[in-house]
Amino acid sequence: MKEMEVRAFKDDIKKYKGKSVAVFVYEGDLKPLARLSKGTSNKAKRVAELENFKGKEGEILKVPTLGTSVDFVYIVGLGKKEKVGEDTYRRASANLVKRMRRDKVESTVVVIPRRGDVSKEITKAITEGAILGNYRFDKYKSKKEDEKFEIKEVLINRGDEEGIRLGKIFAEAQNYARNLVNEPGNVINPITLAEEAKKLAEEFGLECKVYDEKQIQEMGMMALYSVGKGSATPPRFIHLIYKPSGKPKEKIALVGKGLTFDSGGLNIKPGDYMRTMKMDKSGACAVLGIMRAIAQLKPDVEVHGLIGAAENMPDGNAYRPDDVIKAKNGKYIEIDNTDAEGRVTLADVLSYASELKPDKIIDMATLTGACMVALGEYTAGLFTNAPDFAEEIKKTAKRTGERVWELPMDDERLRKKIKNTVADVLNTGGRYGGAITAAMFLEEFVGEGIKWVHLDIAGPAWSKEEYGYYTKGGTGFGVRTCLEYIMKVSSNV
């Protein structure tokens, strides 16, 4: 399958001769149509008025314009002008590409409402939207839908070349993560995930260290080992490293939860809750996607990608409720429930990350159903020990369209819930405030003086529906926000 091309069209749009043009318009404003040739513009405007097209976000009208320089015009609504941001363009571009696929249209050129050159940021957003919107996971379909049809190109009128380059890298990294999330547990397990990391490192010039179950025990990572020891496929610890050529402006550690499948262990999940648990590796897949892009972007930031990969299965050798396990940083964990395994694996990975003495740690984990209860399926919970760092991540997430919402960690009454134990810390905190007590558990394993943000991506890591630039399945949530933030640190913006 040939990949869809996204590139700039630098000429006056009136000179374009092709199948279609896509004009993005604000709600109630069809003036951008006047940028087309007079005949095309008049036909498109007349039909839009007859069809009562408003230009609301998500609206797309296809107008036949045979006899002019193009066969038809897509009029794509952006919504109210004052509410339009980068993510509006990203969503509009994705919706356009999905409509093109439905109509079997191979190419188009995008025209935005503003005159003149398109900014790097908006070009990047349109590029990302097109590539993300064109994503499909049909690897396991013996007969593919639209097997003989592929969109060939999306052109951006007066688009910025650097914006296109960045948009491609960001979106392809997210799609790479989506592919990994969507792979089932019989394909991606701890060993094959580690092999994928090594393959990625070799292809993109990263350093990669993989530790097997024996080495994991020797390193004192008994929490990670314990979660994975009930599976026929033993755990792996993965460490990917990117170092810039000069002195790094910062050192950032990215930590991803890598449960390649979560049955719940001895506290086994009911069947309905076990379905889709291949997505419990979403944090790890996001880290791999980010590292893929970092190797191409080459920021002046040292970046470490850290993944604890395990499969949580019931077995005669599986860890049990009441077990007490010593984590890498020397703290003892009492197991209350084996289905609260993600935080147990992350205890060791965060401890290892802290030993690297980074300036900042960002962890991403499909950690708690409680976070979904609190925030819904589309928003990640954000938890932190550093308010200034959290604000930067929140600002970045607003630009990328990856919704996050900060939840509090200052109630010591909740913290006591994970201290009611024979050990240093308990792996559950009771029914209420579960996302917060899980984050408080993780904080126990973050080193002194290190700024840390935890993203509970249990909701937005997986989509049950198609919307915007997402299809059903893995979303690759967190990839673009982390990349955007790292590039911001690199450029000192």
Curated annotation (Swiss-Prot):
Catalysed transformations (reactions): Release of an N-terminal amino acid, Xaa-|-Yaa-, in which Xaa is preferably Leu, but may be other amino acids including Pro although not Arg or Lys, and Yaa may be Pro. Amino acid amides and methyl esters are also readily hydrolyzed, but rates on arylamides are exceedingly low; Release of an N-terminal amino acid, preferentially leucine, but not glutamic or aspartic acids
Known cofactor(s): Mn(2+)
Main location: cytoplasm
One GO biological process term: proteolysis
Known EC number: 3.4.11.1, 3.4.11.10
Any one of the GO CC terms: cytoplasm
Class of enzymatic activity (EC top level): hydrolase
Annotated localization: Cytoplasm
Pfam family, one: Peptidase_M17_N
Residues reported in the UniProt entry to bind Mn(2+) 1: D262, D339, E341
Binding sites annotated in the UniProt record for Mn(2+) 2: K257, D262, D280, E341
Active site: K269, R343
GO molecular function: manganese ion binding; metalloaminopeptidase activity; peptidase activity
Cofactor note: Binds 2 manganese ions per subunit.
Keywords linked to the UniProt accession: Aminopeptidase, Cytoplasm, Hydrolase, Manganese, Metal-binding, Protease
Annotated family: Belongs to the peptidase M17 family.
Role of this protein: Presumably involved in the processing and regular turnover of intracellular proteins. Catalyzes the removal of unsubstituted N-terminal amino acids from various peptides.
Protein name: Probable cytosol aminopeptidase
Species this protein is from: Aquifex aeolicus (strain VF5)
